[in-house]
Amino acid sequence: MLRILLASLMFSCASPALANGGAAAPVSKPAPTILIFGDSLSAGHGLANGQSWPSLLGQRLQAENSPYTVVNASISGETTAGGRTRLPAALERTKPAVVVIALGANDGLRGLPVKQLKENLVAMARVPKGARARVLLVGMRLPPNYGAAYTEEFDRAFATVAKQEKLPLLPFLLEPVAADRANFQPDGLHPVAATQSKILDHVWPALKPLLK
């Protein structure tokens, strides 16, 4: 009698599909993720929630019914050395399909060695590639007051890494807004909210081919 009761209970707890002889419902895959891994220029320094270009990217993808979601793991003040240390945990946590590496500005502003910048960018590019994530490298440029030799070497670093690691490259994140001082907050470094859609429109053609 006990065996009959147990068998009856197990059958009643089975899924409706199985109980009726049908197939189990398919398990849905998690939405693919785009990980934005940058500094204050991507973190939205001085902006309200939802105004940064990564936030606008998420809104655009949603409006287009794209399956992709955006995780913005950018941190103000981050250098490539800090990003190199932090990236493995971020990848483990988010398991992204696409990673946008947009670091290097703070290395340049602090005058850190360009050799170190390149080594860190290479290391960061290889970690997501090893996890079969697609990588977009986003470059930065410095104002001329850092000296011609340093700024030229700094500018070339991103192209060198992209070529070596066979990565798509967006040479300069702020290309569409950099020439006009009115596009920046009082600190002269961080773009205002009104420019963020222009930055996204600049990033989009380089990013879209990676959204397979």
Language-model features and meaning:
Residues M1-A7:
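Sec-dependent signal peptide recognition
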Residues A14-S15:
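N-terminal signal peptide c-region/cleavage motif recognized by signal peptidases
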Residues A19-N20, P186:
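Intrinsically disordered, low-complexity segments enriched in small/polar residues
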Residues N20-E78, R86-K95:
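Serine-esterase "nucleophile elbow" of acetyl-processing enzymes
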Residues S66, R84-K212:
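Alpha-helical cap/lid subdomain in secreted, periplasmic
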Residues A81:
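Short, mixed-charge aromatic SLiMs
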